[in-house]
Amino acid sequence: MAERKGTAKVDFLKKIEKEIQQKWDTERVFEVNASSLEKQTSKGKYFVTFPYPYMNGRLHLGHTFSLSKCEFAVGYQRLKGKCCLFPFGLHCTGMPIKACADKLKREIELYGCPPDFPDEEDEEEETNVKTEDTRIKDKAKGKKSKAAAKAGSSKYQWGIMKSLGLSDEEIVKFSEAEHWLDYFPPLAIQDLKRLGLKVDWRRSFITTDVNPYYDSFVRWQFLTLRERNKIKFGKRYTIYSPKDGQPCMDHDRQTGEGVGPQEYTLLKLKVLEPYPSKLSGLKGKNIFLVAATLRPETLFGQTNCWVRPDMKYIGFETVNGDIFICTQKAARNMSYQGFTKDNGVVPVVKELMGEEILGASLSAPLTSYKVIYVLPMLTIKEDKGTGVVTSVPSDSPDDIAALRDLKKKQALRAKYGIRDDMVLPFEPVPVIEIPGFGNLSAVTICDELKIQSQNDREKLAEAKEKIYLKGFYEGIMLVDGFKGQKVQDVKKTIQKKMIDAGDALIYMEPEKQVMSRSSDECVVALCDQWYLDYGEENWKKQTSQCLKNLETFCEETRRNFEATLGWLQEHACSRTYGLGTHLPWDEQWLIESLSDSTIYMAFYTVAHLLQGGNLHGQAESPLGIRPQQMTKEVWDYVFFKEAPFPKTQIAKEKLDQLKQEFEFWYPVDLRVSGKDLVPNHLSYYLYNHVAMWPEQSDKWPTAVRANGHLLLNSEKMSKSTGNFLTLTQAIDKFSADGMRLALADAGDTVEDANFVEAMADAGILRLYTWVEWVKEMVANWDSLRSGPANTFNDRVFASELNAGIIKTDQNYEKMMFKEALKTGFFEFQAAKDKYRELAVEGMHRELVFRFIEVQTLLLAPFCPHLCEHIWTLLGKPDSIMNASWPVAGPVDEVLIHSSQYLMEVTHDLRLRLKNYMMPAKGKKTDKQPLQKPSHCTIYVAKNYPPWQHTTLSVLRKHFEANNRKLPDNKVIASELGSMPELKKYMKKVMPFVAMIKENLEKMGPRILDLQLEFDEKAVLMENIVYLTNSLELEHIEVKFASEAEDKIREDCCPGKPLNVFRIEPGVSISLVNPQPSNGHFSTKIEIRQGDNCDSIIRRLMKMNRGIKDLSKVKLMRFDDPLLGPRRVPVLGKEHTEKTPISEHAVFNVDLMSKKIHLTENGIRVDIGDTIIYLVH
């Protein structure tokens, strides 16, 4: 991106922002209390929340994009007269902060302070192997993945902290987890305040037991959930050290911090008899090769199964007597997950090498092939999955590459004893349609990248990167039973169907290798712990009812919710390590981060009355309530309408004040988040609200808006590549309003949005230009036109303002902010620029200032600082934060259409004039350039020519019969071609149909009308001065096409005028300026028949750009046209022996004799070959 030339404009915006933020702070504009609002709620309230961000670093542009949706919504709803609350908390619960602090502590213990680290050895490059490592991230592990994301490229925590710009002295403090809670939350608030958020900061808090009020609130929530039988105790998957005999949490790990369990679908591939000789001793037993897959939805396309010939495998007996074949490592994991009779014991019945089961025949679930075979793949690794891999060449680049190797290389088949019939008949089966890659995505991408074999590891990794994520988010199923459904919606359903049928099992292993401090490689084990029973039927049913009434703004979000409710089961809500609130009935457990963050929006409603504005809840409570007084019964009374008044020392009126706040603000009117939180946090949010208020559906969430991820300059944000911006960096670079404008423009849907730096820079220029224009208008108030605002362009501009208000209102209401920015700023500014250009009589004062006021209000949710500043420039006494949405007056659509017509005609005429001036093709171009025409006749048609009239009638008939759509061109061409009256015109007919179809898209059904809704001749005549000036012509006349020659009559149609340019002949005379030292010169000018002073002065102004004002020029003729021009002018006597030419005088030209005379008051006067012009 090109370097900026300077920062004056962005500095100007930042200076305004600082002043305005100070003003808001002083006036406490965003602080709201239910007690003072209840009397004035005729237009309702609006309570919006954003998932509190995790406090292990600075906020970045991705956070800002999501929260900007809340911010814009609040800005709009304030203008609509609602009482708005936007609170903002900060999340500290969970493992990452504690793990980072403990890691720092360990580094200091091992390497000193500051640490002297050993040279980092080159880490072994991880080979891309057939283990499906390009996987869809498990969003439920969002907090852990954040820890990984913060790690950057440094191996050591100390290095990571250094990369944040911290000194050695400061870093040491971060070895205590509490310091993180003191350091990052104030920075987050500082950055968000710079953004200009409309937040009531009194209600902010941090989570964990550091804040005794929040701690008490979460304990109350969990006691209530347990009381209602929503929390159970039982076995859950966790990282476990067999050597230590206990779960291995982050602080117990030598390597693998932040790593959690990875869920696979374990596919059972039944070995068919006759068994391979190595397995013959197991005759009578059910033997299965078990393959671990992350992509159960692809299994409809299995063609074979892979094993590595030189890898060791075992067969072990499962709890029900079946034999599973896999690696020893996978069997060890399975033995801790209930697969074997005794926990942790693998009863091995057979040891074998992969090559000993090659060629075995299998029965595989879901695939259309009745029998598939075990084939060799040389790149399988032992440290991931089971060592057995099922092959889906339609959707896996590794599989199609390996299958092609075997098909192409007879010698390879012979080496491993593979018969042709085990390989050659098996072709990829279409399972999933992926936009851009078709229904055999792996085949397509391998051909595109020219992948030659399974050893092209780098290209195969690139291929998987390209199709796996796209396949998950955009892939559409093609198989029966799931046809037309999105992959992400059916993935879990397919997995469940297979498990229920006994064809698959859930299998877990660590995402990456985890080594305990005792140097034991960890497994995933089923361990006892507390969990929320989300799958429970009645709870799920009630949550589905909540979802039915939830506004999701787009169908994809609703489908994602529905799919999640379909598969969501128990969720472990307790941990033994990290920060957070302890389970009230079992203090050894901490409540984990996705479980203490489901109904905290209720805490926002009362936080300011408890905490005294202190994030940690350590200040004196405004109501004098101590944390320990907030018992379960007290919380019940505050949040449950029917709960009795508790035994407490707190005065009733104080608890009633808390209750009033909750009752006033609840439910949450809008929650905004990234779409990746739908399958976890947002679904838990619905579940928990239903559980806590089962009989009060009026307390359930009202709306959830999910957005896509944010790209930066069309690329993924990444610290390692440097394509990354923190919130504070973005504000420094673009100002708050400049950044907000670009965020609004980044995107509205659940697809990925794009923050473009060039757009942000262009936005800064637009905002600066806008405020400068407002200043200019305020300064020139007196010189603007007054009186009735009733010219054609006045009326058009007024209608366009009103239409803009209505469209922008609709876009804001639907949370389509990119569209609201388009209709409420870009199109609004374009309407003003058009008015300024068209209003040849000058802009009307009343309209200009109505425009400024309306524009400021429409833009205020996006750019509040600048709009507050402009509001002040307009002399408004109150803050724009207390203003109301503008009232739209009547909209004359016909008038707007007629103005659009005028702009199109002007554009067409300019193009035609340009083409007229260009030498004809094929002719020599060394001739003089063509002389510019002086006159133009525009022909307008009252009706369509007969052939067009007939064509339009046919199109309208089809449009109305075909559900307001036009059929294919073949259908239209067939009917029109059979009509005798059109035979002569068929060359013109289909291009005319194409033009109508194109305009139908742009302008709607009115394009099919046989007559225009306005008088186009009248529109052109009202704007004749503008058209003449715009084309720099002398004169334009408008006539009906019926007055023109045949060709024009045949082709001219309503709304598409034709024209003829011409050069009106004239006689050249000298135009002399006798005034000394004024920069005006003498020139030759053409005088044409019928000219007057006005037309001659306008012609002069085109040649002499120094003349700005027509009224300042005066024309004079010599009393003696023959001798007068020969006399030397005398200084100060420029008027002597000359007569002023009246504005009513008409010039007459005799082309034959090349002479000019004036007709004035019926008297004819010769003027010779020279006249005088004076500029005053």
From Swiss-Prot:
Positions annotated to bind L-leucine: 52, 54, 594, 597
Function: Aminoacyl-tRNA synthetase that catalyzes the specific attachment of leucine to its cognate tRNA (tRNA(Leu)). It performs tRNA aminoacylation in a two-step reaction: Leu is initially activated by ATP to form a leucyl-adenylate (Leu-AMP) intermediate; then the leucyl moiety is transferred to the acceptor 3' end of the tRNA to yield leucyl-tRNA. To improve the fidelity of catalytic reactions, it is also able to hydrolyze misactivated aminoacyl-adenylate intermediates (pre-transfer editing) and mischarged aminoacyl-tRNAs (post-transfer editing).
GO molecular function terms noted in the UniProt entry: aminoacyl-tRNA deacylase activity; ATP binding; leucine-tRNA ligase activity
Family: Belongs to the class-I aminoacyl-tRNA synthetase family.
GO cellular component: a single term: cytoplasm
Organism field: Pongo abelii (Sumatran orangutan)
EC number(s) stated in the UniProt entry for this protein: 6.1.1.4
Name of the gene this protein is made from: LARS1
Gene3D superfamilies: HUPs, Isoleucyl-tRNA Synthetase, Domain 1, Valyl/Leucyl/Isoleucyl-tRNA synthetase, editing domain
Activity control: 5-fluoro-1,3-dihydro-1-hydroxy-1,2-benzoxaborole inhibits LARS1 by forming a covalent adduct with the 3' adenosine of tRNA(Leu) at the editing site, thus locking the enzyme in an inactive conformation.
Region described as Editing domain: 260-509
Protein name from the UniProt record: Leucine--tRNA ligase, cytoplasmic
Modification Phosphoserine, positions: 167, 720
Coiled coil: none
Binding site for ATP: 719
GO BP annotations listed: leucyl-tRNA aminoacylation
PANTHER family for this protein: LEUCINE--TRNA LIGASE, CYTOPLASMIC, LEUCYL-TRNA SYNTHETASE
Family matches, as InterPro entries: aa-tRNA-synth_I_CS (IPR001412), aa-tRNA-synth_Ia (IPR002300), LARS1_ULD (IPR054509), Leu-tRNA-synth_Ia_arc/euk (IPR004493), M/V/L/I-tRNA-synth_anticd-bd (IPR013155), RBD_LARS1 (IPR055416), Rossmann-like_a/b/a_fold (IPR014729), tRNAsynth_Ia_anticodon-bd (IPR009080)
Keyword Endoplasmic reticulum: no
UniProt free text on domains: The structure of cytoplasmic leucine-tRNA ligase includes four main functional domains: the Rossmann-fold aminoacylation domain, the editing domain known as connective peptide 1 (CP1), the anticodon binding domain for tRNA recognition, and the vertebrate C-terminal (VC) domain for tRNA binding.
Keyword flag Protein biosynthesis: yes
Superkingdom of this protein's organism: Eukaryota
Residues with the N6-acetyllysine modification: 970, 1047
Region of interest (Disordered), residue spans: 115-142
